[in-house]
């Protein structure tokens, strides 16, 4: 059975192997101290766990994933620096989000870092965001749902049998 830890591990491996992602974090987004992250941590892939649906034969894990970067405000003339940096940030982080989705969607190939038993539900809607901390972060968030086998096997449950 593919566990919650396994799915988080796939995301972490994708972040580690991707040439443009510099760090991976998971947990509740409101618990992150963005101000403690350094410039070398960006681009960040962040996975916030959502609900899990336990169904007959299928377990569905839901995550909101964020791909975020600091805005480069050194590009362009003064009135346009932030706008140009934001557009570039949106473009680059959306491409990275598509790469993450491709790893899950094409997990049946031998080149994916995701187990072939994991099925990503499509379509996925991505939403742009910009947040101001000590720096200006921009990127995309998307809620993903991944289905895995759920054996629902009472024989292997660590419970005393009703005899």
Model-derived segments and their meaning:
Residues 1-9, 56-58, 67-108:
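Extracellular/virion structural assembly segments
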Residues 1-58, 107:
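Small/polar-rich, solvent-exposed N-terminal microdomains that initiate assembly or binding
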Residues 23, 38-42, 89-147:
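Acidic-leaning, charged glycine-interspersed low-complexity segments
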Residues 48-50, 132-163:
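Charged, low-complexity C-terminal accessory regions
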Residues 57-74, 135-148:
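Oligomerization/assembly interface segments of phage tail-like spikes and tubes
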Residues 63, 83-85, 158-162:
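Generic alpha-helical propensity signal that fires on short helical segments
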């Amino acid at each position: 059975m593919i566990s919650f830890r396994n799915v988080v591990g796939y995301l972490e491996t994708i972040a580690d192997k991707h040439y443009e992602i510099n760090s991976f974090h998971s947990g509740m987004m409101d618990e992150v101290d963005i101000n403690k992250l350094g410039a070398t941590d960006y681009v960040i892939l962040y996975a916030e766990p959502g609900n899990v649906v336990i169904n007959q034969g299928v377990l569905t894990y839901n995550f909101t994933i964020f791909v975020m970067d600091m805005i480069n405000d050194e590009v362009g003339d003064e009135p346009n620096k932030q706008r140009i940096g934001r557009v570039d940030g949106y473009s680059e982080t959306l491409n990275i989000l598509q790469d993450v989705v491709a790893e899950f969607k094409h997990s049946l190939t031998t080149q994916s870092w995701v187990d072939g038993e994991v099925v990503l539900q499509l379509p996925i809607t991505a939403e742009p965001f910009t947040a101001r901390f000590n720096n200006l972060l921009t990127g995309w968030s998307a809620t993903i749902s991944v289905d895995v086998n759920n054996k629902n096997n009472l024989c292997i449950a660590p419970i005393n049998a009703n005899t």
